């Protein structure tokens, strides 16, 4: 299922914000993540968040001093998918660097990561809404099979057979359309995962689709003509 979702969302590449790299684990990061955290931090973040933040923090705290500089923090923010301009990143840092000493301790780092992730989430939600409107030509709140196939063929270089196969796999309720929630799940899956996967339809057209799209993205205009009934 996931591979087909990737195939649908790949045609939205030009709108897609860059996703952050996966946080690598190391023995050093694992040791630090198992250390006890201050109680107030444990109340603000989930155990999973603290583990990921600690691993990422340790990647940049190379001297083990317990603090990182602003430049390292910027790189950490970018690595989780926040591709804002310098002024926006500086504003986030200014908000979390409570003592203003230009060094970020782990507690400040956690606050910055959480804020950055919220910004990325908001950006992704706006992206999903815009993409849904591109497919939903008649603005009735659902994407019909004809609407899906039209966009997929016109701007994703799908042929009829591949477009139909992908739609049928995504239409898990088999009612002939995709709801806004279903579409959001498809695009969120694409934004959060590596798009370099094949569509598992068992058809040679899939490989040709991947070959055509490895090095370029399909343009997505702001306005499209009416989809044929």
UniProtKB/Swiss-Prot annotation:
Stated name of the protein: Uncharacterized calcium-binding protein B0563.7
Positions bound to Ca(2+) 2: 97, 99, 101, 103, 108
Protein origin, superkingdom: Eukaryota
Span of domain EF-hand: 48-83, 84-119, 123-158, 159-193
Polar residues bias spans: 21-39
Gene3D superfamilies in alphabetical order: EF-hand (1.10.238.10)
A single GO cellular-component term on record: cytoplasm
Stretches with biased composition (Basic and acidic residues): 194-217
InterPro entries from the UniProt entry: Centrin_CML-like, EF-hand-dom_pair, EF_Hand_1_Ca_BS, EF_hand_dom
Chain residues that bind Ca(2+) 1: 61, 63, 65, 72
Keyword Calcium annotated: yes
């Amino acid at each position: 299922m996931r591979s087909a979702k990737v195939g649908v969302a790949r045609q939205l590449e030009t709108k897609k914000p860059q996703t952050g790299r996966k946080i690598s684990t190391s023995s050093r990061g694992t040791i630090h993540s198992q250390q006890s955290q201050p109680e107030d931090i444990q109340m603000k973040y989930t155990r999973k968040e603290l583990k990921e933040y600690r691993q990422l923090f340790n990647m940049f705290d190379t001297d083990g001093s317990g603090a990182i500089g602003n430049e390292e923090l910027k790189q950490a923010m970018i690595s989780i998918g926040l591709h804002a301009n310098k002024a926006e990143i500086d504003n986030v840092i200014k908000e979390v660097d409570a003592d203003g000493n230009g060094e970020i301790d782990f507690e400040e780092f956690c606050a910055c990561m959480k804020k950055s992730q919220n910004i990325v989430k908001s950006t992704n939600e706006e992206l999903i809404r815009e993409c849904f409107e591109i497919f939903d030509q008649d603005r009735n709140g659902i994407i019909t099979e004809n609407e899906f196939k039209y966009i997929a063929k016109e701007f994703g270089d799908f042929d009829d057979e591949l477009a139909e196969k992908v739609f049928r796999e995504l239409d898990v309720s088999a009612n002939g359309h995709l709801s806004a929630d279903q579409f959001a799940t498809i695009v969120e899956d694409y934004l959060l995962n590596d798009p370099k996967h094949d569509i598992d339809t068992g058809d040679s057209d899939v490989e040709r689709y991947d070959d055509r799209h490895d090095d370029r993205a399909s343009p997505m205009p702001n306005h499209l003509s009416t989809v044929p009934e």
